[in-house]
Amino acid sequence: MPVMPDHWIREQAVSNGMIDPFVETQKRDGVISYGLSSYGYDARVADDFKIFTNVDSAVVDPKNFSSDSFVDRKGPVCIIPPNSFALAHTVEYFRIPRDVLVICLGKSTYARCGIIVNVTPLEPEWEGQVTIEISNTTPLPAKIYANEGICQFLFLQGSAPPETSYADKAGKYMRQRGVSLPRL
């Protein structure tokens, strides 16, 4: 599965709407970088966040998830408490081609501050805004900047399309917008 280069990403974004909105050059001055890079695309985090709280002494249960576990915040920055976690989503909406799998990695700027980003792979023919899991592994509050880079997506093209895509399975996170909480 080769990693796809900038010109392929640009062509897919412009001609097929793979990334919308698409930033054709990497923005770097005074911000955490975002936009097209040599072999990937650095996505931005939107300005609405769900921050974990334990006010009600809740238990996190992926099979019986309660939105009471979160405090909603909207703004140009998000402060994640020490050793805590937040959910956010990309500004960009992705439409993944049938023969492509997308892997996400965190930005080194955040990782060097103890802020870890996790996103599961974007499967063939999945589309939507990407829900991003952000962990603050430090004993200090951590600041996340909305509308700036949060993670990098790498596009891997398979040798052939899969027999069954995410769209074929009618996946539960298809066409999500905003932050999507766990679903069964």
Curated annotation (Swiss-Prot):
Swiss-Prot/TrEMBL keywords: Hydrolase, Nucleotide metabolism, Nucleotide-binding
Taxonomic superkingdom: Bacteria
InterPro entries: dCTP_deaminase, dUTPase-like_sf, dUTPase_trimeric
UniProt keyword Signal, yes or no: no
S-S bridge residues: none
Annotated dCTP binding sites: K107, S108, T109, Y110, A111, R112, Q152, Y166, Q176
Function comment: Catalyzes the deamination of dCTP to dUTP.
Family label: Belongs to the dCTP deaminase family.
Name of the featured protein: dCTP deaminase
Organism of origin: Acidiphilium cryptum (strain JF-5)
Gene name per UniProt: dcd
